[in-house]
Amino acid sequence: MRTTDFASLLSKYLLSYLPCQRGVSDNTLASYEAAFSRLLQYCEEERGLPVRKITVETLSPDLIEGYLNWLCEKQKNSASTRNQRLSAIKAFFKFTRRENPRYIYACERILQIPTKKCPTPVLRYLSYEEIKEMLEKPNPCTEKGFRDLLILCLLYDTGARVSELLDLTVGDIHFGRYARVQLTGKGNKSREVPLSAKTADLLKNYIQRQNLSSPEKQTQQLILNSQGKSFTRAGITYILQKYAPDGHKKITPHILRHTKAMHLLQSGVNIVYIRDILGHVDIKTTETYARADTEMKRKALEQAYPTPVPRQGTWQSDSKLMDWLKSLSP
């Protein structure tokens, strides 16, 4: 194999296949790039293997497993991050197997590497009282306060990922017979999520205040920071932290997403609808919320048939039985 084959395959995978054919998001692409950047770093620093000498066969199971161990032990990555890196590598080898069947054996060996079991993280979410407290904190009479309130309401009302919020354009908001927002999620898959009347009113007011109703503004980003630039994830997280309910040190956009899902579930919304609102591909992902809600489990048990335990009688002493038991002792 020529020394340029690996570089050629990796370039085609990252620059053409993932963004153009698969249509992955920028965040997914960045994650895949990080996986291979770290792998090349490991090869050079730990194995003394220059990038120009790396081939498909060079990336043996032993080398990949060494890389994964290096991530956990030296780089202090979590088991979850380790598994994400492995997933990116496996996806590349599936691509390589399809592009060049000559390397099917080398690819299959990598695909057999198992993921590492990791503890199930505690699902953090806010109660209805806490989300109410949070939404009451911004001052809607100021420009920043109004914008911040809109951000909080959109994240909670739609259950959107932070990347979906940041990608929203004016044209993604629809006010017809019922208000709704079009979100673009993982794999560039779009979905429409209904908006509550109060969030819709906030949006109408915001669009009017910002002069965003003209046709030429439809492709403009909906929410910008004070400098008129795109928000970053860190910027949105900072806003959430500023209005965090009492007793919560760290609030992230994903906690609001979890909160919306749990509140829908607790309100009796069918889990299939919750899956569609959140944009999950696999309903098993949505079922995580059902497993996490201990209060719902308790109520379900209370509503079920009671365990038919018979009434316990009163123990009556039997002198003959006691005498017989004593006779068994030496």
Ranges and model annotations:
Residues M1-P330:
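Conserved catalytic core of the tyrosine transesterase superfamily
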